[in-house]
Amino acid sequence: MSAPREDADVETSSEGYARRFAGPVGRFFLERQAEATLALLRPFPGASVLDVGGGHGQVTGPLVDAGHDVTVLGSDASCEARVREWTGPGRARFVSSDLLAPSLPGRSFDVALSYRLLPHVSRWPDLVAALCRLARRAVVVDYPTRRSVNAVADLFFGLKKGVEGNTRPFTVFSDAEVEEAFAAHGFAPTGRRPQFFFPMALHRGLGSAGLARGLEGAASALGLTRALGSPVILRLERRG
């Protein structure tokens, strides 16, 4: 019996999911994510980027505006809805295919990127393999790390769901297991950007972008975010 098709991006491409990032606090989250992403892509100006599971559209605009050639891959045609602002006028492209076995040639993009997906895919090593197959130069992914409050994620899941409403269970990774999975395909880490020291659910619950900026600014200045921040955005480059 074949494994069920992975479609976690259908949820992250929905309007309901987008509402989690609405308002000033949500915009702060997305700004921080975009800044980290563009910094990690700085060695690859004008790169062709495949955003696997990127129907959430969180980085489509920043990538396009920075001059990258963007293709969004979704598991279903419905995942295009939130990126049609860019795909409609031809500023980006959308393709629908199996997330774990995309019908695209190997090494056909400079960079394969995937956010909001790795922790929600049951066969995540297969996603890693797919990203590595498609990337000519680098892969960029995000993941919740155990080097943070996520180490006790199960204990706080009920509280998190109470604040966020539509949160889902997710896999928390050690940095080593993510790096080892990519190493098996010839990729090594070359850039790491932990995003938040304090839980995102806490910032949502407090509801103040100004306070969130202040707290995270202080944590960054003290080196806490670098040591214990999550989710981590990781860049890995092909070796050999």
Label each PLM-derived region with a short phrase.
Residues F157, G191-G240:
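A C-terminal cap/extension of S-adenosyl-L-methionine-dependent methyltransferases
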Residues L113:
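A conserved beta-strand element that flanks and buttresses the S-adenosyl-L-methionine
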Residues K160-E177:
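Acceptor-substrate binding/catalytic loop of class I
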Residues P125-A138:
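A short glycine-rich, Lys/Arg-flanked "PGG" loop and its adjoining helix->strand segment in the class I
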Residues H56-A101:
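Class I SAM-dependent methyltransferase SAM/SAH-binding core
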Residues M1-F44, G46-G55, V140-G162:
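Conserved class I S-adenosyl-L-methionine
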